[in-house]
Amino acid sequence: MPCVFCAIIAGEAPAIRIYEDGGYLAILDIRPFTRGHTLVLPKRHTVDLTDTPPEALADMVAIGQRIARAARATKLADATHIAINDGRAAFQTVFHVHLHVLPPRNGDKLSVAKGMMLRRDPDREATGRILREALAQQDAAAQD
C-alpha cells in the first residue's frame, strides 16, 4: 500500500499545510486530539526511529518547537505535548516517521496514562490559517 504521507508531500492527497521547507512538511492531523494537533513529516520517507537519521529527528523537533510557540502565541494552547509513536506497539498507524505536536488548553482532558479523548476541530481551515500567520510573524520578528 502506498504511503499516505508521501502522497500528501507530493501534493497527490489533501492536507491542511502549516509549514513547509525543502526537507519537511507540517500538516494538521486529520483526527486531532486537540485543536491545532499538527504532524511534522520529513519529506524523505523513513519508517521509524531505526532508519531515520538523527539530524532529521533534530530538525523535526525544531519545527515542532516553532509550531508550539505559534500555538501559544495565538492562544490555541497553554502547553505542548511533543511525541513520536515509534512502531505498532506505540500506536504508530502510518509507517512514515512523524512528530506529533499537540497543543492542549487548560481544562482539556488529555492524558497519556488514561487514554486520549478525541476532539474535533470546529474549523480546521481557520486553525491552519491561524498557525501559518503566527509562524510568519515569528519569521518576521527573527529578521528584525
Curated annotation (Swiss-Prot):
GO BP terms in the entry: nucleotide metabolic process
GO molecular function, one term: catalytic activity
SUPFAM superfamilies, per database record: HIT-like (SSF54197)
HIT domain span: 4-111
Ranges spanned by the short sequence motif Histidine triad motif, renumbered to the chain: 96-100
InterPro entries associated with the record: HINT (IPR039384), Histidine_triad_CS (IPR019808), Histidine_triad_HIT (IPR001310), HIT-like (IPR011146), HIT-like_sf (IPR036265)
One protein family per Pfam: HIT
PANTHER family according to UniProt: ADENOSINE 5'-MONOPHOSPHORAMIDASE HNT1 (PTHR46648:SF1), HIT FAMILY PROTEIN 1 (PTHR46648)
Protein name stated in the entry: Uncharacterized HIT-like protein MT1300
